[in-house]
């Protein structure tokens, strides 16, 4: 069993598991942190960005000044943002049989894999994962395509040139694999390969293994996966949460008795308490609005935004902010808000029960009805007419490199009355803000990440007790900025096996058993013999028939009856006869009793020597020795067949035949 690690990002995993002749891809996350190296794509022409100076090498050579621009001491690529793809050279991706998706954030690289690698298999995911994943992809494509940029930068990617660049461009990894965004046509083609599954649904893969999705408690429809055969079990835990938010709670019990547990997608902010962050978010938002400023919340169109809107619903009246408009701007805003209300079966029990009252599961429905929350596809059109300040705007993209958020950063960045509040943990907020410097607006970092922290993981591993844990190397050592915090790493016994991008891991257990069915007529013919009290054995002579990874023992063919005529035999009739098997022997030879038996049968001058594996009985007069070991007995004599047979018969008296 092998694990191929195609992604270096611990919360955006992409691994391939080879297990019992099946090749299974576990997630296909897309590392978007590469976009932080690019200039933002403004919806409205930005003189500030257009007039940034080009960057030159230290020797004054300016051949890169069209590709690289400098802003407040940072250097950025002036081109359409590109994404860091999973490894495509480590394994032939056309051999992948299935792709298992754990949540909608971990499927963003799907079109690159299904459309450009020769992949012909099936993708499995829950319905909310597919529908919300579609929204995320649609929003991403829309953000990139609505701001066309003719210029394409590639000179800086040359290895000899890249090492001359300042950080972080100099340190960027795998830049040759970075690619532009896919198209909606590729998105639709990729999604057409997905087969919808429900929690606890068992899916057979070629008769070899069975895969089952379990609720992971992190997002709508998010899953952990069990991959098992009759005698082996692998658990894949990715993006899980034990906090009570809007999704169904995590199914922990089904993870027990795993041979291997692959662990990814832990919290990116292990020292931040989500509840505390939500409190800070609300108080900073209220403070800004009371002072006449606007609040910008860069976010994804699904996930944490539902919880933030629910908190604001409970908070704004008590804080005296009921007249402050909330705007949600995204090409998929309407679809996202509607989907959150119709996926009732995937919600926690508390929200499920509201559906039957009838009451909307999420309070943002009431915010929309009372005109406190308004949603728009973009800043153009109706939004321009309705827009009033001070206000709170939820919009994307959290990287601040594309989407409507770029417009608001340019619009509000010059005033210290305004505040941008970062709640998504996927991007460094300092790097996200770099191309907007100098910046007057206040910046608040309230990362809300409900995924498992290290304390919760340690407790979980003690409860489910897998034989082996496999995880990204980032989880086996403290964060570089907090090297003294030994509590910010996985602590388990035996120690976790770690992996990094482009590594192949041989998983530390071997398959020992295979399930075989036996036909009734063959079973009827068996005659078990008791070799120990309560233990019986029977020899089986049979034909092993294997098809679709299922094995069947059939009765051996009967010997062909001789025919009198000269009729030609058909090829199919020419079945080889089964050989007559020698009886199997069982038992042990007690040395003292064996020596006594030899003496009774006329052997003298017998000497016994102990060895590491058993005993040697020397018959010095006959120049013969008998090696008695745990699993074999050898009679060594010099060309005296009669003596060997005589000794063999004496040995057989101590063994059972069957």
Curated annotation (Swiss-Prot):
Changing residue 644 to E: Abolished interaction with INTS11. Its main location: nucleus. It is found in: Nucleus; Cytoplasm. GO terms for cellular component: cytoplasm; cytosol; INTAC complex; integrator complex; nucleoplasm; nucleus. It comes from the Eukaryota. SMART domains: Beta-Casp. GO terms for biological process: negative regulation of transforming growth factor beta receptor signaling pathway; regulation of transcription elongation by RNA polymerase II; RNA polymerase II transcription initiation surveillance; snRNA 3'-end processing; snRNA processing. InterPro entries: Beta_Casp (IPR022712), Integrator_9su (IPR027074), IntS9-like_C (IPR048660), Metallo-B-lactamas (IPR001279), RibonucZ/Hydroxyglut_hydro (IPR036866). Signal peptide: none annotated. There is a cross-link at residue 58 (Glycyl lysine isopeptide (Lys-Gly) (interchain with G-Cter in SUMO2)). A motif (Nuclear localization signal) lies at residues 566-570. The keyword Cytoplasm applies. Keywords: Cytoplasm, Isopeptide bond, Nucleus, Ubl conjugation. Coiled coil: none annotated. Residues 548-574 are annotated as: Disordered. SUPFAM superfamilies: Metallo-hydrolase/oxidoreductase (SSF56281). 1D-myo-inositol hexakisphosphate binds at residues 2, 19, 510-511. Pfam families: Beta-Casp, IntS9_C, Lactamase_B_6. Component of the Integrator complex, composed of core subunits INTS1, INTS2, INTS3, INTS4, INTS5, INTS6, INTS7, INTS8, INTS9/RC74, INTS10, INTS11/CPSF3L, INTS12, INTS13, INTS14 and INTS15. The core complex associates with protein phosphatase 2A subunits PPP2CA and PPP2R1A, to form the Integrator-PP2A (INTAC) complex. INTS9 is part of the RNA endonuclease subcomplex, composed of INTS4, INTS9, INTS11 and inositol hexakisphosphate (InsP6). Interacts with WDR73; interaction is required for the assembly of the RNA endonuclease subcomplex in the cytoplasm. Component of the integrator complex, a multiprotein complex that terminates RNA polymerase II (Pol II) transcription in the promoter-proximal region of genes. Belongs to the metallo-beta-lactamase superfamily. RNA-metabolizing metallo-beta-lactamase-like family. INTS9 subfamily. Although strongly related to RNA-specific endonuclease proteins, it lacks the HXHXDH motif that binds zinc and participates in the catalytic center. Its function as endonuclease is therefore unsure. This is Integrator complex subunit 9. It comes from Homo sapiens (Human). The gene is INTS9.
């Amino acid at each position: 069993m092998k694990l191929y690690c195609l992604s270096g990002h611990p919360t955006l995993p992409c691994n391939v598991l080879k297990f019992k002749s099946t090749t299974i891809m576990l997630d296909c996350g897309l590392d978007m942190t590469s976009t932080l190296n690019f200039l933002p794509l403004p919806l409205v022409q930005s003189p500030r960005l257009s007039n940034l100076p080009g960057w030159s090498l230290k020797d004054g050579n300016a051949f890169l000044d069209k590709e690289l621009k400098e802003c407040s001491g940072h250097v950025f690529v002036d081109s359409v943002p590109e994404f860091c793809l999973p490894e495509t050279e480590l394994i032939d991706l056309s051999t992948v049989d299935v792709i298992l998706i754990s949540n909608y954030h971990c499927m963003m690289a799907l079109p690159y894999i299904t459309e450009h690698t020769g992949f012909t298999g099936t993708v499995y995911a829950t319905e909310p994962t597919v529908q919300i994943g579609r929204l995320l992809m649609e929003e991403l494509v829309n953000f990139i395509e609505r701001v066309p940029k003719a210029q394409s930068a590639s000179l800086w990617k040359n290895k000899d040139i890249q090492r001359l660049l300042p950080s972080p461009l100099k340190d960027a990894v795998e830049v040759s694999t970075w690619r532009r965004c896919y198209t909606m046509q590729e998105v639709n083609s990729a999604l057409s390969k997905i087969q919808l599954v429900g929690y606890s649904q068992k899916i057979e893969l070629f008769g070899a293994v069975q895969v089952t999705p379990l609720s992971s408690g992190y997002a709508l429809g998010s899953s952990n996966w069990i991959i098992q055969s009759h005698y082996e079990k692998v658990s894949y835990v990715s993006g899980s949460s034990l906090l009570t938010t809007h999704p169904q709670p995590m199914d922990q019990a089904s993870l027990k008795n795993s041979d291997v547990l692959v662990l990814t997608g832990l919290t990116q902010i292990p020292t931040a308490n989500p509840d505390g962050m939500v409190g800070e978010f609300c108080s900073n938002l209220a403070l800004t609005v009371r002072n006449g400023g606007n609040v910008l919340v860069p976010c994804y169109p699904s996930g944490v935004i539902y919880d933030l809107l629910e908190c604001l619903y409970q908070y704004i009246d008590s804080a005296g902010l009921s007249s402050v408009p909330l705007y949600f701007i995204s090409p998929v805003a309407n679809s996202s808000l509607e989907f959150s209300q119709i996926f009732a079966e995937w919600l926690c029990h508390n929200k499920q029960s509201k559906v039957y009252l009838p009451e909307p599961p999420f309070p943002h429905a009431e915010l929309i009805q009372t005109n406190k929350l308004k949603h728009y596809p973009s800043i153009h059109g109706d939004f321009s007419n309705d827009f009033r300040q001070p206000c709170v705007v939820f919009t994307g993209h959290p990287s601040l490199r594309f989407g409507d958020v770029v417009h608001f950063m340019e619009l509000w960045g010059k005033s210290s009355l305004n505040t941008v509040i970062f709640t998504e943990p996927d991007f460094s907020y300092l790097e996200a803000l770099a191309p907007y410097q100098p910046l007057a607006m206040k910046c608040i970092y309230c990362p809300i990440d409900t995924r498992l922290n290290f304390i919760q993981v340690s407790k979980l591993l003690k409860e489910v007790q897998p034989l082996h844990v496999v995880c990204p190397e980032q989880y086996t050592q403290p964060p570089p900025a907090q090297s003294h915090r030994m509590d910010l790493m996985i602590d388990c016994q035996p120690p976790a096996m770690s992996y990094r991008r482009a590594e192949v891991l041989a998983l530390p257990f071997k398959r020992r058993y295979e399930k075989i069915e036996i036909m009734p007529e063959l079973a009827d013919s068996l005659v078990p013999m008791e070799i120990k009290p309560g233990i019986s054995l029977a020899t089986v002579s049979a034909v092993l028939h294997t098809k679709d990874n299922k094995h069947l023992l059939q009765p051996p063919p009967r010997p062909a009856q001789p025919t009198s005529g000269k009729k030609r035999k058909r090829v199919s009739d020419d079945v080889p006869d089964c050989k007559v098997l020698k009886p199997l022997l069982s038992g042990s030879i007690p040395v003292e009793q064996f020596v006594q038996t030899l003496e009774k049968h006329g052997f003298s001058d017998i000497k016994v020597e102990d060895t590491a594996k058993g005993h040697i009985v020397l018959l010095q007069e006959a120049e013969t020795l008998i090696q008695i070991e745990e699993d074999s007995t050898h009679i060594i004599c010099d060309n005296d067949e009669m003596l060997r047979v005589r000794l063999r018969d004496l040995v057989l008296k101590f063994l059972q035949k069957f």
